[in-house]
C-alpha cells in the first residue's frame, strides 16, 4: 500500500491488509468509522521524530474508535502489531514516559514510524491483528511457531468405491473429513489400523481405475479389492459406512456389530470368516488404545494448558472430536519472559485459530485476557457459537488437569534440551576455534541415484535445536553437471542459496553484537558440509566468488575409515584436518546434525523420485485434464497404449473430440512428423 493515500479525505479500509491496490476499499460516508489514518498515510509533523515524541504526534489525529496499529523501526521492519477498542487511548499509553516494562520501553525507543487502520468493531480488529502478526512476525509480539496445518482423514465421496486418505489443506474434494489429528504419524497409524479393520482402499483413483488384478494389500488382508470386484458394491458400501461410524464416535456400536458377526460365523463353523472378524476387532481396539483418555461428556473441544518457567512458555493442546481423543501437541511460542502467561495464551489462541476451524468448545486451564471478546470473534469467524470455558469441576476439569500435566512434562524436556544445546554449541565453538558461539548452523547434503533426481538438502540448527521451518531443498537444475558430480551439485546449491541470501538480506554485520530482542538470524554463522577436501574446495570457491568468504565459516565433515561413525575427519580453514575423540559430546552433536541433513536430503530425493515414477505422459498434454485422462486410461489401460493409438481410436473414447484426439496424437508423434 506504499504510496496510497485516501481520496477526498476518505479512509483506506483493508480487512486483510494486502498490498494490492485492487483490495483497497474506499468507505462511503454512510459506512465511515471515525476519522483516522490509513496504513500508508504520512504525518508531516512527525518527520524527524522518534520514540515517544513520534507517538505523541500521531495520537493527536487518532480517533476513539477501534482499529489496529503497527510500529516500525527506521529500516521499515514491523516491531509490533496491536489492536485497540480506542486507538487514541491505547496508543497514547505508549507516549507516557513511565510505567513501561523493559520490553515496551525498548520497543518505544526503536519506533520511527506508525501506521493505523480503523475497523468497524473490536472483533474485526482482533481478527485482523492475529492475521497480521502471523504474516509479519513482529519481534515484540507473542509469535506462534510451528504453525503447520493439521492432518485429517478423508473418506472420499466422488468415486464408485470411496477411498481412505490422509489430507491437509482446503477441503476441495467431496467426502467426509475426520480430525484434526495432532500429527501425520497419528493419522498414518490410524489409517493403517482402519485398513485392517474395514479393508478400504488407499490407492489413487488412477490406479483404482486401471487395476486388472488385486494388489498385494488384498493378499495381506488390508484391502477388499473393489477395483477388481472381489467385493460387491453393497458389501463395500457397508464397510465404508462402518468406517464412517467408527470415526464419528460410534465405536461401541461398530464393535458390537462386528462381534455379533464373529459369533454368528463361529456358530456356523465358518472359522476362517470368524478369524477375519476377530482381526478387525483387534485393529479397532488398537486404534482406541492409542487414543488414551476418551471422555464421555465432551463431544467436540480443544483443551489448552500452559506452563511458564525459566523464560519459556509451553502450551499443550489436546484435540477431541466426536468424543474421541485425536492426539495432542506441545507448542513453545516466542514471547518475552516479561509477558504474563494469560497474555501469552490469549495471543496464542487468536493466532492459532486464524486459519484453522474452531470447535464449539475451547477449554482453558486459566482465564485469559479479553476472553469474552475472543469467544465472540471466534464465533463470528466460525459461523456458530464458540464457548471459551475454564472448567472448575467434573470431567472437563480432569481434561484440563491432564493437559496441564503434559504441559509441565513437555516444558521440563524443553528446558533440558535447551540447556544441553547451549553447552554443545559452546563446545562446538571451542572445538573449531570460533570467535563466538554460533546462533545458526546450516548443514548441507546431496542425494541422488547415479545423478538422477538429484536434490540438495539444507537443515538448520540453533540454540533451541533443529529449526524445521527453515529447512530448504534444492532440486538440481544445471544441465551441464555430469551425472553423479557431487562437487558440481554442491556448487549449484551454494550459489543459489547465498546469491538469494545476499539479494534479500545483504551482507551480515559481524562486528555488531546481536541485540537482546534479535530474532533468529537469516545468515548462518557456520555451514557444515557432508564431504571432505573436494567438497570444501568447491564451497570455498563459491563463497569467494560471492565475496562472502569472511562472513561464513565453512567446515567439512568427511566420513571415517570404512565409513565408520566416530572416525570422521574435519576440515576447517587455516588448520590441518583432524579427528575428535570417540566420546567427545561435540562429535555426537555433529553426527546428529549430519544425520538430520542426510535424512532430509534422502527424503526429498525419494519424494522427487516417486513423483517422477508416477508421472504420467498424459499430464504434459494441453487440454487433457483429470476427466479425459481417466477416460483414456480406462479405455486403453496404459499411457503407452494411448501413445500407440490412432486418431480414430482416440475419438472412440467418450469425451475425446477430433480436435483433442489430434492434439494427443501429435504430442506422441511430433518427433516422427519432424
Swiss-Prot record:
Major place of residence: cytoplasm
Domain UVR intervals: 252-287
Any one Gene Ontology BP term: SOS response
Single GO cellular component term: excinuclease repair complex
Location of this chain's protein in the cell: Cytoplasm
Keyword DNA damage: yes
Similarity comment: Belongs to the UvrC family.
UniProt-recorded name of the protein: UvrABC system protein C
Taxonomic source organism: Rhizobium meliloti (strain 1021)
The encoding gene: uvrC
Amino acid at each position: 500500500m506504499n504510496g496510497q493515500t485516501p481520496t477526498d479525505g476518505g479512509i483506506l479500509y483493508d480487512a486483510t491488509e494486502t498490498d494490492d491496490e485492487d483490495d483497497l476499499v474506499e468507505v462511503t460516508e454512510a459506512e465511515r468509522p471515525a476519522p483516522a489514518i490509513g496504513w500508508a498515510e504520512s504525518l508531516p509533523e512527525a518527520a524527524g521524530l522518534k520514540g515517544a515524541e513520534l507517538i505523541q504526534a500521531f495520537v493527536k489525529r487518532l480517533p476513539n474508535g477501534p482499529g489496529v496499529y503497527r510500529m516500525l523501526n527506521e529500516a521499515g521492519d514491523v516491531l509490533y502489531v496491536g489492536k485497540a477498542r480506542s486507538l487514541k487511548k491505547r496508543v497514547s499509553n505508549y507516549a507516557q514516559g513511565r510505567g513501561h516494562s523493559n520490553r515496551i520501553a525498548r520497543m518505544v525507543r526503536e519506533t520511527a514510524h506508525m501506521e493505523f487502520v480503523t475497523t468497524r468493531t473490536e472483533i474485526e480488529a482482533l481478527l485482523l491483528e492475529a492475521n497480521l502478526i502471523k504474516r509479519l512476525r513482529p519481534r515484540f509480539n507473542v509469535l506462534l511457531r510451528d504453525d503447520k496445518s493439521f492432518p485429517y482423514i478423508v473418506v472420499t465421496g466422488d468415486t464408485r468405491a470411496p477411498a481412505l486418505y490422509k489430507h491437509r489443506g482446503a477441503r476441495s474434494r467431496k467426502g467426509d473429513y475426520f480430525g484434526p489429528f495432532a500429527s501425520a504419524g497419528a493419522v498414518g497409524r490410524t489409517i493403517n489400523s482402519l485398513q485392517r479393520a474395514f479393508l478400504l482402499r488407499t490407492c489413487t483413483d488412477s490406479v483404482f481405475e486401471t487395476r486388472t488384478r488385486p494388489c498385494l494389500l488384498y493378499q495381506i488382508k488390508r484391502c477388499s479389492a473393489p477395483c477388481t470386484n472381489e467385493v460387491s458394491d453393497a458389501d463395500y458400501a457397508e464397510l465404508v459406512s462402518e468406517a464412517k461410524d467408527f470415526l464419528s464416535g460410534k465405536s461401541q456400536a461398530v464393535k458390537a456389530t462386528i462381534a455379533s458377526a464373529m459369533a454368528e460365523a463361529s456358530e456356523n463353523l465358518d472359522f476362517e470368516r470368524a478369524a477375519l472378524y476377530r482381526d478387525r476387532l483387534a485393529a479397532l481396539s488398537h486404534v482406541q488404545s492409542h487414543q488414551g483418555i476418551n471422555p464421555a461428556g465432551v463431544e467436540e473441544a480443544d483443551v489448552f494448558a500452559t506452563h511458564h518457567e525459566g523464560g519459556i512458555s509451553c502450551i499443550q493442546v489436546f484435540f477431541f472430536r466426536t468424543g474421541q481423543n485425536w492426539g495432542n501437541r506441545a507448542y513453545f511460542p516466542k514471547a518475552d519472559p516479561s509477558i504474563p502467561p494469560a497474555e501469552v495464551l490469549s495471543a496464542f489462541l487468536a493466532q492459532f485459530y486464524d486459519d484453522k476451524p474452531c470447535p464449539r468448545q475451547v477449554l482453558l486451564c486459566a482465564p485469559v485476557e479479553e476472553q469474552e471478546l475472543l469467544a465472540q470473534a471466534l464465533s463470528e469467524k466460525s459461523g456458530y457459537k464458540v464457548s471459551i470455558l475454564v472448567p472448575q469441576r467434573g470431567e472437563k476439569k480432569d481434561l484440563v488437569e491432564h493437559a496441564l500435566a503434559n504441559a509441565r512434562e513437555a516444558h521440563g524436556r524443553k528446558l533440558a534440551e535447551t540447556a544441553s544445546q547451549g553447552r554443545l554449541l559452546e563446545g562446538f565453538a571451542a572445538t573449531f576455534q570460533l570467535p563466538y558461539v554460533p546462533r545458526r548452523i546450516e548443514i548441507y547434503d546431496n542425494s541422488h541415484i547415479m545423478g538422477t533426481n538429484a536434490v540438495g538438502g539444507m537443515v538448520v540448527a540453533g540454540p533451541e535445536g533443529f529449526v524445521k521451518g527453515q529447512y530448504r531443498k534444492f532440486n538440481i537444475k544445471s544441465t551441464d553437471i555430469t551425472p553423479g558430480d557431487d562437487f558440481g551439485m554442491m556448487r549449484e546449491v551454494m550459489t543459489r542459496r547465498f546469491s538469494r541470501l545476499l539479494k534479500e538480506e545483504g551482507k551480515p554485520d559481524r562486528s555488531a553484537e546481536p541485540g537482546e530482542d534479535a530474532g533468529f538470524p537469516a545468515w548462518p554463522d557456520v555451514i557444515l558440509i557432508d564431504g571432505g577436501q573436494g567438497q570444501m574446495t568447491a564451497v570455498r570457491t563459491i563463497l569467494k566468488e560471492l565475496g562472502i568468504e569472511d562472513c561464513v565459516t565453512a567446515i567439512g565433515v568427511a566420513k571415517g575409515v570404512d565409513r565408520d561413525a566416530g572416525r570422521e575427519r574435519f576440515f576447517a580453514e587455516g588448520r590441518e584436518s583432524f579427528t575428535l575423540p570417540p566420546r567427545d559430546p561435540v562429535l555426537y552433536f555433529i553426527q546428529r546434525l549430519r544425520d538430520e541433513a542426510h535424512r532430509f536430503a534422502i527424503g526429498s530425493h525419494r519424494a522427487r523420485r516417486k513423483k517422477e515414477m508416477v508421472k504420467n505422459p498424459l499430464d504434459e498434454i494441453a487440454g487433457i485434464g483429470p476427466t479425459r485422462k481417466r477416460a483414456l486410461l480406462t479405455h486403453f489401460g496404459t499411457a503407452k497404449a494411448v501413445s500407440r493409438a490412432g486418431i480414430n481410436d482416440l475419438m472412440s473414447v467418450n469425451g475425446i473430440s477430433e480436435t483433442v484426439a489430434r492434439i494427443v496424437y501429435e504430442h506422441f508423434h511430433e518427433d516422427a512428423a519432424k
